[in-house]
Amino acid sequence: MKIRKLRGIAEINDYIESYLAKWDLYACIDTDFAYDPTIDTVFWSVVVSEENDKAFKEFFKKLGCNVETDVFVYSIFHEIGHSQTLEILSDMDYNYSQDRKADPNISNEEYFNLPDEIIASQWAVEYINNNIDEVKTFWSGLQVLLKKFYKRNHIL
């Protein structure tokens, strides 16, 4: 069986990375959203998990996010939030969060409320609420590339 590369990933990554440059961050596709502070990289994904995505959007609303947008946007800004809040998190809170994340049975509710996760989400909500036009412009440009990606790869 021949495996082909998905076309358009580099273009999406470049777009995200150019946006992340304002925080001196890099972008890389992966199987899930994440932030790696050792390489200043935000990992992003096109994988959809309807249950988790719905729960994450609801969590952002509970935190006071006034902008209705795609979970991709919330996820990107949440990961940026990790980069912006890492230094204010105590070692004890960080270690506790990492220990709890090792539990494969952790619920979304507990995960979202871990010290490192909630502070990153709070940062994201504040940034999104205070920069609505910028966030909408970012998402509009990204949507064009994502739709092109789906079409080129016969995903939708």
What residues fall within each predicted segment?
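A conserved beta-strand element that flanks and buttresses the S-adenosyl-L-methionine
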Residues: 76
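Long, well-structured alpha-helical subdomains associated
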Residues: 103-156
